[in-house]
């Protein structure tokens, strides 16, 4: 049995909201539990994610001799595509990596960081009252500097051995060929009608495709594999993020990405 266990949490976060809004709305809907209960036992390795395609990507990496870190990275690249409501390269991540053979626990903190230009009043309106939940979360001010790309890159440098080109292959194939939205994604999209679909590009991408394709995501992953995770924090990727965020009241600059 491989004596390595890896636990990875990837997510995106928002900051200050009204207390009443916290109970009224949440970033992601509960989609229920399945009545099917199965027990599976792994004698050599096991991969578990919330998406079968991500699980398959991780499993195949392990089957070909990859490490738990390699498997987690491959899975996260897929999840960033198929579950954008939950995680992605634009968010933050925490990783806990345990090597049982060495009894060694290693943690990685890849939480997003606030822009240098943010202030204590960042999420207050002109009347000095906290912004409402959706007012804040749909605003550029809710976007920090992504930590996930750096965490995945550093995790691979420390504990990976499979070539990054191999790790991006499942996600790139799905992005180019397309994938059917999961129940969780569809319910999130349904819940956000009237908000998310107000943006033309969001509407075209999420609501006008039964099979979702994302060539831009594939291109970013290829750049990640070819040039390393730091390419995410440089032109043109960083510039595209900054421009998009700052059109919606954000204050990101290249200094935040350096």
Give, region by region, the residue ranges found by the protein language model.
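Positively charged n-region of N-terminal signal peptides that target proteins for export
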Residues: 1-4
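Cleavable N-terminal signal peptides
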Residues: 6-7, 17
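Extended rod-forming repeat segments used as scaffolds/tethers
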Residues: 9-10, 77
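N-terminal signal peptide c-region/cleavage motif recognized by signal peptidases
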Residues: 12-14
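Noncatalytic scaffold domains of N-terminal-nucleophile
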Residues: 20-56, 60, 68-227, 232-234, ...
């Amino acid at each position: 049995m491989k004596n390595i266990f890896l636990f990875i949490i990837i997510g995106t976060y928002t900051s200050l909201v009204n207390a009443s809004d916290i109970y009224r709305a949440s970033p992601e809907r509960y989609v229920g539990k399945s009545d099917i209960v199965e027990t599976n036992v792994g004698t050599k390795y096991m991969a578990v994610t919330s998406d079968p395609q991500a699980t398959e990507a991780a499993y195949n990496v392990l089957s070909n001799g990859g490490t738990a870190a390699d498997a987690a990275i491959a899975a996260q690249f897929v999840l960033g595509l198929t579950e954008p409501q939950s995680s992605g390269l634009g968010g933050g991540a925490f990783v806990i990596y345990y090597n049982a053979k060495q009894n060694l626990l290693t943690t990685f903190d890849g939480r997003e960081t606030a822009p240098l230009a943010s202030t204590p009043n960042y999420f207050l309106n002109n009347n000095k009252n906290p912004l409402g939940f959706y007012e804040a979360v749909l605003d550029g001010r809710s976007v920090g500097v992504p930590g996930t790309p750096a965490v995945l890159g550093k995790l691979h440098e420390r504990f990976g051995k499979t070539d990054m080109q191999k790790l991006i292959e499942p996600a790139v194939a799905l992005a180019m060929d397309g994938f059917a939205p999961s129940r969780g994604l569809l319910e999130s999209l349904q819940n956000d009608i009237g908000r998310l679909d107000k943006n033309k590009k969001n509407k075209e991408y999420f609501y006008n495709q039964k099979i979702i394709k994302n060539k831009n995501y594939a291109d970013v992953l290829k750049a990640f594999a070819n040039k390393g995770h730091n390419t995410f924090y440089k032109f043109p990727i960083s510039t595209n993020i900054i421009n998009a965020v700052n059109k919606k009241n954000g204050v990101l600059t290249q200094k935040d990405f350096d």
